[in-house]
Amino acid sequence: MQNHVISLASAAERRAHIAATFGVRGIPFQFFDALMPSEELNRMMAELVPGLAKQHLLSEVEKACFMSHAVLWKQALDEGLPYVAVFEDDVLLGKDAEKFLAEDTWLEERFDKDSAFIVRLETMFAKVIVRPDKVLNYENRSFPLLESEHWGTAGYIISREAMRFFLERFAVLPAEWIKAVDWMMFTYFFDKEGMPVYQVNPALCTQELHYAKFLSKNSMLGSDLEKDREQERRHRRSLKVMFDLKRALGKFGREKKKRMERQRQAELEKAYGRRVISFK
């Protein structure tokens, strides 16, 4: 398994955390230098996600986060990788993580590497809808289908066809359709045409900040993105008014899709309920 950890080159404390977390378990990994607001970021947006530069409801840091994932996918495609595991540098790993991340036989035995799929390794401790699937358990963890939103991109495995799917669509999406990268991957924001997202349960990883919040403790690492989002909230609310008229042009079709999705989720929730995906 190729494990890539997105991290700022200057983030010494976080990189030490990752080296210790992965190293003690013998999990191979490599850092992928996260993008920062810069001319390089602007060039990569123009090449891969041109609408993102015009999306003023996202901060520059959120755009850099989005593009760090997109550029990593493009690199994986260029290298011909069938799939890649992606992590962020504040991730915590659960029990026996090395059995999932230091080898990939389990993955190829359960998933068609030539198809589009995501295996979500992370939990955000939100109540979500998951539907049982026929994928066999591995090391006391199951792989139900994720049927509701579940934020976060701290840990996931994405196949080549899924990377290609997102990059092809990101390249043509208008600005008003673009959201934060976790919204694009793990909600019904746009039709993923049946591409499955499997939620590992119990989760194999979580963000240190959200685990600390879940335990009502103080975070040791914090979240640069969360800080940036907090600073941007007021700015977003004012900008939102400017976009309401433009968004109204395509509103009715999207609203119909949302209503259908809400109805589908209501039926699934009635059948399966909502649950917090645990971490261990």
Swiss-Prot record:
Pfam families named among the record's database cross-references: Glyco_transf_25
Domain of life: Bacteria
GO BP, one annotated term: lipopolysaccharide biosynthetic process
Name of protein: Lacto-N-neotetraose biosynthesis glycosyltransferase LgtE
EC number: 2.-.-.-
Family of this protein: Belongs to the glycosyltransferase 25 family.
GO molecular function, one term: glycosyltransferase activity
Function in brief: Adds the first galactose to the lacto-N-tetraose chain in lipooligosaccharide (LOS).
InterPro entries: Glyco_trans_25
UniProt pathway annotation: Glycan metabolism; lacto-N-neotetraose biosynthesis; Bacterial outer membrane biogenesis; lipooligosaccharide biosynthesis
Annotated signal sequence range: none
Source species: Neisseria meningitidis serogroup B (strain ATCC BAA-335 / MC58)
Name of the gene: lgtE
Keywords, sorted A to Z: Glycosyltransferase, Lipopolysaccharide biosynthesis, Transferase
